[in-house]
């Protein structure tokens, strides 16, 4: 009887699991090819908080094709989808930088292929900008929560060659977007 109850319990547990939904890359012809100065654009889909479903799409004006969820297909050995809450995406040089806020990292990819180059850990990162071979990213420097004792936020400097954090400066609570003005 114990064996029957154990098997019944195991069967119920396995039957209650939800199927894992994985978004595959999709190519969609949306327009005729265009000869413009802008070759295309990347679109960061943030996904729902807690679902690890941020994705990157690319609209290629030269072919008229829209590439949906290109990161997962370009990186089959990585965890599917990009992470939890895509917050910002920028191009600098031949690299693509995606700030994945709740997953606490900046994903660095090859600009043409979206293949993973490295991941830069940064707690509750928000936005990124660039100047003279350096990336500057904002961070809340603490978990995503309502906490009256939350730490002060910071801005980090990342070398775009080594892809390592080289400096950081505490700036106050919840720094978000940032701009570089007149070489300062």
Give the positions of each predicted feature.
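Predominantly soluble domains enriched in secretory-pathway, periplasmic, or organellar proteins
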Residues: 17-184
């Amino acid at each position: 009887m114990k064996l029957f109850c154990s098997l019944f319990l195991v069967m119920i547990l396995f039957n209650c699991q939800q199927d894992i939904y994985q978004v595959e890359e999709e190519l969609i012809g949306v327009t005729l090819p265009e000869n413009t100065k802008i070759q295309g654009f990347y679109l960061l889909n943030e996904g729902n908080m807690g679902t690890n479903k941020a994705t990157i799409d690319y609209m290629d004006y030269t072919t008229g094709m829209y590439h949906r969820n290109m990161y997962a297909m370009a990186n089959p050995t990585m965890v599917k989808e990009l992470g939890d809450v895509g917050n910002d995406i920028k191009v600098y040089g031949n690299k693509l930088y995606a700030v994945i806020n709740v997953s606490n990292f900046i994903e660095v990819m090859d600009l043409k292929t979206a293949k993973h180059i490295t991941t830069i850990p940064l707690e509750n990162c928000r936005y990124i900008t660039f100047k003279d071979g350096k990336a500057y990213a904002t961070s809340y420097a603490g978990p995503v929560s309502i906490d009256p004792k939350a730490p002060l936020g910071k801005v980090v400097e990342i070398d775009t060659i080594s892809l390592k954090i080289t400096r950081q400066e505490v700036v106050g609570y919840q720094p978000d977007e940032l701009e570089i003005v007149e070489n300062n």
